[in-house]
Structures are given as C-alpha cells and as structure tokens.
Amino acid sequence: MPSVLGSMMVASTSAAASLQEALENAGRLIDRQLQEDRMYPDLSELLMVSAPNSPTVSGMSDMDYPLQGPGLLSVPSLPEISTIRRVPLPPELVEQFGHMQCNCMMGVFPPISRAWLTIDSDIFMWNYEDGGDLAYFDGLSETILAVGLVKPKAGIFQPHVRHLLVLATPVDIVILGLSYANVQTGSGILNDSMCGGMQLLPDPLYSLPTDNTYLLTITSTDNGRIFLAGKDGCLYEVAYQAEAGWFSQRCRKINHSKSSLSFLVPSLLQFTFSEDDPIVQIEIDNSRNILYTRSEKGVIQVYDLGHDGQGMSRVASVSQNAIVSAAGNIARTIDRSVFKPIVQIAVIESSESLDCQLLAVTHAGVRLYFSTCPFRQPLARPNTLTLVHVRLPPGFSASSTVEKPSKVHKALYSKGILLMTASENEDNDILWCVNHDTFPFQKPMMETQMTTRVDGHSWALSAIDELKVDKIITPLNKDHIPITDSPVVVQQHMLPPKKFVLLSAQGSLMFHKLRPVDQLRHLLVSNVGGDGEEIERFFKLHQEDQACATCLILACSTAACDREVSAWATRAFFRYGGEAQMRFPATLPTPSNVGPILGSPMYSSSPVPSGSPYPNPSSLGTPSHGAQPPTMSTPMCAVGSPAMQAASMSGLTGPEIVYSGKHNGICIYFSRIMGNIWDASLVVERVFKSSNREITAIESSVPVQLLESVLQELKGLQEFLDRNSQFSGGPLGNPNTTARVQQRLVGFMRPENGNTQQMQQELQRKFQEAQLSEKISLQAIQQLVRKSYQALALWKLLCEHQFSVIVGELQKEFQEQLKITTFKDLVIRDKEVTGALIASLINCYIRDNAAVDGISLHLQDTCPLLYSTDDAVCSKANELLQRSRQVQSKTERERMLRESLKEYQKISNQVDLPSVCAQYRQVRFYEGVVELSLTAAEKKDPQGLGLHFYKHGEPEEDVVGLQTFQERLNSYKCITDTLQELVNQSKAAPQSPSVPKKPGPPVLSSDPNMLSNEEAGHHFEQMLKLAQRSKDELFSIALYNWLIQADLADKLLQIASPFLEPHLVRMARVDQNRVRYMDLLWRYYEKNRSFSSAARVLSKLADMHSTEISLQQRLEYIARAILSAKSSTAISSIAADGEFLHELEEKMEVARIQLQIQETLQRQYSHHSSVQDAISQLDSELMDITKLYGEFADPFKLAECKLAVIHCAGYSDPILVHTLWQDIIEKELNDSVALSSSDRMHALSLKLVLLGKIYAGTPRFFPLDFIVQFLEQQVCTLNWDVGFVIQTMNEIGVPLPRLLEVYDQLFKSRDPFWNRVKSPLHLLDCIHVLLTRYVENPSLVLNCERRRFTNLCLDAVCGYLVELQSMSSSVAVQAITGNFKSLQAKLERLH
C-alpha cells in the first residue's frame, strides 16, 4: 500500500535526520570541550598578577606545592623525570685533561646534538647521545675564552654551511663554518645531524681582533646576529656580511655599551659599565626580539632589537640591590638573603605568556618574574623592567617537610619547567624539577616538585630542541586560537616528552620530563595491570574525565611495544572511568573534608561520591572545569518527564544527567586530536609569482604530515571504540546494586517517611535514564570519529594529488564555499563539498586518460561513508562517458555510451541527473537522456506514489506523495528540457551562427556541438518517438503538458496513447486553463473520428462561461460542432445525434442574433462605458432569446436586433413590427442627416434592401403596405425622387403586381396626408413611374402573368384618368393626365 511505503519513507527520512542531529550534538560537545581546552590561564593569571604595578607573591601556601607535605593530597608516587641514558665522556677527552694548562669549559649545542669541551686553545665536539663522532679544532694558538654556535644570516654562505662556530680568545674572534655533507640542496633540511656528516671547515670564515677585550660568553639570535659579553661590562656584536663595501668591512665588532646612544637615558635608570662588573649571561627572546644581559653583580639590562630584530637600543637596567629591595617589599616576611645572588636569567617567550617576559632564579631557588611592558599589549615594545611576582621554592609553607633548595648554581627554565642543580657537596649535585604540568588550569599556580641526586658537579644544563606542532591559523579560526601554547596535557598525545641533557665531568645525562601520560604508563607498568590503588589515585588527582583522556592515549596506541600497556590502560579506563549520574545541584552539600581554599560554593554542585577521601577534584584536576563540565550535561527537567516525577518525590526540581568520565574522556581526547584543525578553514589562498605575474592558488590549510599524524590518532581511537563496544553498555561489574545506584544519583535525598522500595525503583529508573542518554551520546561520538577519520583520509588523498588542480576543477560556487568551510563542517554537514571534491579528483584521472578503477577502489577503502559502491559505479559510468568523446568509431562510441547508461541506471536514483543528461546531450546520446531519466523516476518512486498523489487531486496532507511526485517531475524535466533545446535549435535562424560578434575578419565557430536545424529537428523526432514508448503514465502526462506549453499541439495530437484522452478529459475538468484543454480535446476526437464526442466538446466550449472565448469564437465552435454532428449522423443513424444536430442549428441562429447585437453596440455606442460592459457580457456566454431582447436589444433601442429577435422567436405583433420598421427607417434618416439627398437616399436604400432580403419572405415581419406608405411620406416630405421607393422595392425583389396593388390601395385610401403636404398627385406620380418601368421592361413580370398584368394596368389607368378628370384642372393635373394617356397607349401596344 502506498501509505505503508510512505511510512517507511518518512521513517527513513526521520532516521537520516536523527543521525544528522546526533552528529550535530556530538559536534557541539567537541566545540565546547575545545573551547574549555583553549581557556587555559596565562602565566600572569596563574601568578595572580593583574598589572605590572600590582606584584604578588606565592609559594608560602600549602597548596602552592600540594605534594610538599603529608596529608595535603593522597596522590600516587609520580616520577617527574625519567633518565634515558648516561653517556660517559669519550676516553680521548679524558686523556686531554691531563694536558690542560690554562682553562677548560664545557657546554652543549642542542641544534646539532653535540657537546663541546675546550681545553686551552683546542675545542672538541662529540655526540652527547652516544659519545661518538668526536671532532676537534686545534688551529688556535691562544686559550679559548668563549664559545658560541650561530645559525648564520640567510644568503651569505653556501647551503652546506648551516652553522657557525664562534671562538673568542684574548687576542681575536674566529668564526668557523660547520658543514654538513648530507644537506639536500635548496631544501633547507638537515638530514640526521646526529649521525655524522658534520665537518668543521679548517679555514676561518672571519677573524677579527678583540682589541684586548676579555670575552666571557657568546650568544646569537635566530636571524644570525652574534652578541658577545665582555669582562669589561660591555655588550658587543660581531656584524658580518658577504663582501666588504665602500664604508663597511666584511666583519667588524660593535660595542653597544660605549657607542653613541640613540636615546635619552631616563634619570632613574643608573647604568654602570666597569671591568668590576662583567656581563656573565646573555639571553635573547627571539619571539619578541628582546635581549637581556646579567652581570656578575646581578645587574639586568634590557635591549630592544626592534620589531624586525635588526635594531638595537638599551631601554632598561636594574641593579641586584633594586631587585632585592622590590622582592623584599613584595614578600615582606621572607629573609631577603634568598633573593640574591641571581644565578640565572631565562626568557619567557610569547608562546608561554603575553605579560611576563623574563625570569630570574636566585641561589635559593626563588623565581623572580619580570615584565618589560604594560599587560595585554602583545605588540608593545619593551620600555621598563618591573618585578611582578616572587615565587618561593618548595619548603616555605608552614607545614612543609621538604628541604628548601640552596646553593643553586645552574638553572634552566623551559616552557613552565624549572630545572635547578644545587651543590650538595663537592662531588654531587641535587637536581630539582618544579613544574605545573599536573595543574595547568588551576589558579593560583600549583606545582609539583621532585629532587634527584646527580653524580658530579653539573657543568651545563640544556633543553634539547623539541618538536613543535605548528598552529593551523586560518581566517575562520584566527580569533579563537590562543597566542600562547596549550598546556602539555592538551598536546601530550602528539608531542613527545621534553628532553634535557646535563653535562658533568662524568659525561652526559639524558633525561625526559614526563608528561601525565608517561606517568600513567609508569604506574601501569609498575602495578602490572589496569587496577590498583595508585592508578585509582591518579584518576582522582586528574579527575575522571581528564584521566580517561590521558588513558586513551595509551589504550588507543597501535605500536607493537605498547600492546600490553594498551590492554592495561583499557582496563583502567573502564574500571575508573566512572558512570553516568543524575545530579540534583540544589541539595549537594560541600564535602566536609574540603579546606577553606578548595571548599568554594562554586564547586558544591560537582558530583563527589559520599565519603570520598579526596578534596573536590574540580579544584585540583586537569583542567579545572569541574569533574563533569555542565556543558556536557543533559538537562532532564521537562514537564511530565520521569526526572520531574522523581524530583517531585523528593521535593526537588531540575535534575540533570552528568556523563561519565569515560564519555567525557572520549570527547576530550577526540577534541585534542582534532583541536588544531577542527575549526580551521579547509583551504587558504596563496599568492605566488609566475612569469612576472601574480597567481592565486587555493591550497590545503593543513600539511600532509599533520594530517598523517591526526589520522593515526583517529584510527587508534576508532579501533578502540569499535573494539570496546561495551563502553556504552554500563560499567564493569554489577550495575544494579542499590548502594551503587544511590551513588550515581548524586544529591538525591532519601525521604524521611517515604516508601523505601518505591524510592529504590525511582533511583534505578533514574540511573537507567542516565545510562541510556550516555549510550546515545557515545554512539553519536563514535559515528563522528568514524566520519572524521574518513573525511580527513579523503583530504589527505586530495593533498597527495595536485590539490590546487583538483580544486580548480570545481565550480566557482564550490570554490567559494570551500573558503568558508571548516574541517568540522566537512565532517558533519558538507556532503555536497566532499562529493564535488571526489568527482573533481576522478575527473582529473579521466582527463589524464588514467583508469579510475584504482582510485575508485582506494576511495572505497579509505572513506566508504563518503564514497560508496554506488559512487564507484558512478565513477565508472562517468569514465565511459568522458572517454566516448575521444573515440572516433561511431560504433565503439555508441557501445561505450550504452555501457555508461547501464552503469548509471544501476544508481539512477542517486546520480546527478541534470549533469549527466547535459553531458549526454553534448555527445548527442539522446536515447540515454530518456532512458536514464525514466529509470531514475522509477527508482525514486518504485511504488507509484507520485501517480497516486496526482490522480487523487494532489492532497496537501500527503507529504510523501508530494515529495515523490516532485522527484518524478524533476527527473522528467531532464527529458523535456532536452526536447525544448532541440526545438529551439530547429527553429533557430540558419544564418545566426555566422553573424559576427564584433567588427573584423570572420571568426570560425568554435562549437563543434552546434546542431543544424535539420539535425535538431531529426533528433527531436527520434527522441519524441522514444519517449512515446514509455509505459510511465505520469511521464506521459508530463510530456503532454510540455508539448502544450511549447505550442506543439499538432505533435501532441499525433500521439497514439491510452493516457492522452483521460489526461485531456481530466485537465478540461480541473485545470484553470480549461479552454485550452477542451480545444485540444475536440481536436483529438475529430482526429480520431469521434465526431459525436467532438461536437459535444465544441458545444460545451461554445456554452462555457468564460471571458477567454469571444462571441465570434463561440459561433465558430457551434459551426464546427454542426459539421462534426453532421459527420456523425452520416456515419451512424443514432436518433440522439440527429436531435443534437437540431439543437446546434437552433443555437447557431440565436448566437448570430447575439453577435448582431454585439456588433451593433460596438458600432453605435462603443464610446459608452455601460455599453462596453454589455459587449463583454455578450462575449462571456451564449444567451437565450428572451435575455437578448430584454437585457440588450430593448434597453439599447436596437430596432433591427429586436426585429431579428421576434423573427427568430416567431412572435408576430403587427403594431410592434410597424413600430420597429418605422424606428429602423427613422434611425437611418437621422444618422444620415448631414449627407446630401442622393447619399441619404442611397444609404437608406442599402439598409432597406439588406433587411428586405432577410424578411421579405415572411410578410408578417415585412409589412409592405406600411413600409411603402411610410417611405413615400418621407420621400414626399424630403422632396426626394419620386421613383426612390419603387426602385428600392424592385432591388429587394418585391414583384411589380404586388407593388402596384399596394400603391393602388394607398391611392384609393384617400389619405389626407397628401393634401396636407400639398402633394395630392404624389401617389399617381409613383404609379406612373412604376408602370413606365413595366412598359419599358416587360420582363420585370413573368411571361405567364404578363397579359393578365397588362390588362390589370389598363384598367387601373382608366380609373386614374377618370379620377384626374374629376379634379379641378391645373397644370400638374393636365401633365399627369397626359402622361397616363401616353402610358395607356403603350400598354395597349403590349396587349
């Protein structure tokens, strides 16, 4: 039944909409989580510093270092650092120490993975990773005082010289080149610098004298500037260039401390430059182009290198005493001795903080944070040096049991990690590691600390250059991406742990700073499994959701070495990941064990299990958004819902579902995997030059390498979700125990006097609601993960091809859409874009004559949700279609086209029908257009719902029927559009293609597909014949309608189809344009020799009330109906047809009178508005005779028409007839009053003759006596010719005997009128004229009646003569007497 299928279709549509809605909801969860991850505080916020003039202090509270004392937090034993390896010094170097005479130094060059050692005038370098690849330089004769590694300025040296080694002696400064044999020319990539291939060029590139300056340290900027610190307290720079100029040397030394100053030094700033205070450290902030120096006495100076890094200006200097004083004022209770001396300064780059720029570390481990410009002004240049925060090391809180750091001699600060080496004794150091990676979102800053013993005295401590993921910043997300880098916990899935190297006389110590995921791995391995108290504590410390996200990094790992750990992590994920809960915020009390700092009411609604030994995790975890952020909660407070019933039961309102840590952890992990690209633009425009012109290309915003990384992570997550389907089925263990259910319904209070069993049932049902809601959400997330993986896999595939070419093949609208589309949009909603991109990719293969089978299979494997089996079929069909264009053989081309048609027909309900049909038109495969369109219509509506909808009057409530009906019409439109195109082409002017578009020489037409008129006509006929074969009734109807609209009714009537007559009958009954369809219907009947039916349709047309049909047309319809009826009676002798013919003839007679009335009104009264209405009424319908007389002829005084009406009706009233004739004559005379007598006589004669010929045969309506008498009176009055009336009657055809009879009676009636007008002889004159006519032309009377008529005339003349004799004699009487006598003689001769 259609209704059943309709329900199925509605269900299918509803399912698709539900899936889309689920994806949208999952996408919103990810949006929120991503926003949460991006809301991490700046360093200044962690330090609670609001402005440079509002300094703060920290480190004195127990919670600043929550691990520093017992009882603060029950946390697992988490290692902060992990030793990778210890590598002893190469034996060759140990021997060299025996030859030392003056000086030795040691350090690290992380960019080239080398450690270095100077012994007197020699320098040695080796790979600190393994102690190998030892190299040395002994080309100097003086003791080396300072060493520096420089990345050279661009464009000065050959590509293989990637670094410069700068050596300073008491005499000169030598710059050597470091060459790498395995550098790819022009690539800028150093291939495996740690595995050899490095060579120290023996000849110095530059050498210049020191001018007796003792240099202590060398540093360089990223753009190649070299700075040196002098023992004299001056800052020097070595400026170098490729060639010497007119006014500059190739290499020269500049003293920035003694050179002329380009600025006015503020009076408050006291600079001291003396040999007593050497500069011992130079630090460069390459992110802001600022240089800092630290002197031996603790003076810190600030230099501004300018926006471009090429300038130089000293802007601030602060002495150690000033710093100690400022620190003492901030931390008033602390002994000021811990604030000096400063042993290290470190740059805080813009990627870590916008407001804090410099950190100084004292010998007691105190950190001093400085700012050089106002807060919240990232582009401001440095203008001061202000202490904004004092951070005390562990051990300063009241309850701390940790020993305070002391004798710190080396310090390293890197991305929030502070490493300090303190001298325990002469032989050993203690390595401190302090960081806030565990609490990156917590304000104020909370840190963990760890100490470990290091053998030997630390000579150097350095961070090894770490991998950094570039932020994808595009026009769509640039306002949402923080300037600073995300915390480690957010990036730990894609960045390795930070690596450090410590050098001592014993060798190199390599170690990692562990990320939370590394710490979790350590716990899993040490506990040998996924459970244990330590692991549970880890989940509590980091919160369930954050710990689950971290756990997933291990659980989703596909590395072979992680297989066992992955299984343990999976177990921990499900064991400690929590469960969905129902929360009642209004009743949850603050846990009693939460201290004053953590027990803020803002956390009182977080679900904390009763009796938990832990402080509220929302104030400690990573991040501090709450254990289950409200954004991931689902309100369940709809009226009448089960949640509301439970609320009523306990006197509460507003319960909400709080998803489990497992659910939220999956969201967090997915958001972090996708975070770098989720809301980024898909593409960016790049401008490059080619042949001196700029070309704009559209490129992917994400490089392939990043896509590969994201895909690997997504694949692991997808496999995890597929592998562990139980994640949506409830927790491990028995979920139905009462105790556990109560825990999951946080804040649900037991009624004091309530029904315990009923409450337990409510609790159980609540829990099941929460579980079901979470299950639905997780299924949506799983689908989102799957779609994301496939969308990105497709994007990577596009990038691996010629991306700009593929995008260039897209339509302009898709190209523009791409620019405003994010990866999120691509995944969730932009199926059209993905389809267009895939089509473009395949088209590139086809264009290059490459088979699409391979790429099609690859797409099916890579992204089956985006490229299905049907898509593969479509690609194959498209390939056949495109290749057919290149085939010369007509037979082969047709074979390929038919094969493509078969492929398209398999998927016709999904194919882009208009596009394919357009291509078929281009190759003139019109059969394909018809067949494919009809197949598509059938597949889109297999049950014929569209026809059912049409035949039942297109009811509004049948939504499914309307949809299928419209889909069918859209399919048929491809056929009718093609037919229209052929019709237009067949009618096009033959010469039009040759009309030039502009003046100039002739241009040959470049369109090879242009059809001639004849070809177009031929293809039209062929296509129409093919279309007529269809058994699809709805298509036939669509075809008929198109033929009508295209004014091809003749073609329509040639169609022999069982559907045509019913369609025309239906449309003639229901369509607004009924006249057109009825006109076609009678023509159809007539063509098929159904004359009786044609006559009846024509009769209905004539009778139809419509302003579209004129009265003239109605007469034509009646006339055609009469002809058809006569044809019908000629074929068959059915009585009804004869009667109908008679009715038609009568109808025709009345209709003619109606036309006469209308024409008379138009002719005589067209200027009257009321007459116009009457004329329109006469057009609108056929009227009966009574209505014509009463509403038109009589009111408008249309005497002729009234005469016609009574004549037609057979109504005889002599008085009325006389009146009408009199009116007719008088009107004619009145209308011609302005004319001459002869013209008036002519006009009246014409009118009388016209009417006389109509009515003379019916004396009742042509009263000759009255007419002649009235006319003669008018003639006499107007003094017209005496023979006018006789002549007129003669033209009418009135016989002379009858006319003589009328005149004779008129004469004998002795009417006094003639005497009144003084023309008593007028009638005798008329009779004389009449008889004279006879005498002169006897043939006017029939031969058989001539003798009798002659005798009658003689008798009459005798009588007239007698009458004349009785009259008094006058000239007139004598004249007429003579005339009659003469006439008498002539008559006698005729006798």
Swiss-Prot record:
UniProt region (Disordered), positions on chain: 604-630, 985-1012
Modification type Phosphoserine: residues: S1057
Protein localization: Nucleus, Nuclear pore complex; Nucleus membrane
GO CC field: nuclear envelope; nuclear membrane; nuclear pore
Family annotation (InterPro entries): Nucleoporin_Nup133/Nup155_C, Nucleoporin_Nup133/Nup155_N, Nucleoporin_Nup155, Nucleoporin_Nup155_C_1, Nucleoporin_Nup155_C_2, Nucleoporin_Nup155_C_3
Topological category with respect to the lipid bilayer: Peripheral membrane protein
Keywords: Disulfide bond, Glycoprotein, Membrane, mRNA transport, Nuclear pore complex, Nucleus, Phosphoprotein, Protein transport, Translocation, Transport
Main location: nucleus
GO molecular function, one term: structural constituent of nuclear pore
Superkingdom in the source lineage: Eukaryota
Residues in the signal sequence: none
Post-translational modification comment from the UniProt entry: Phosphorylated. Phosphorylation and dephosphorylation may be important for the function of NUP155 and may play a role in the reversible disassembly of the nuclear pore complex during mitosis. Disulfide-linked to NUP62. The inner channel of the NPC has a different redox environment from the cytoplasm and allows the formation of interchain disulfide bonds between some nucleoporins, the significant increase of these linkages upon oxidative stress reduces the permeability of the NPC.
GO term, biological process aspect, one: nuclear envelope organization
Phenotype of gene-disrupted mutants: Homozygous null mice die before embryonic day 8.5.
UniProt family annotation: Belongs to the non-repetitive/WGA-negative nucleoporin family.
Assembly, per entry: Interacts with GLE1 and NUP35/NUP53. Able to form a heterotrimer with GLE1 and NUP42 in vitro. Forms a complex with NUP35, NUP93, NUP205 and lamin B.
Biological role: Essential component of nuclear pore complex. Could be essessential for embryogenesis. Nucleoporins may be involved both in binding and translocating proteins during nucleocytoplasmic transport.
PANTHER family named in the record: NUCLEAR PORE COMPLEX PROTEIN NUP155
Protein name as catalogued: Nuclear pore complex protein Nup155
Record organism: Mus musculus
Gene responsible for this protein: Nup155
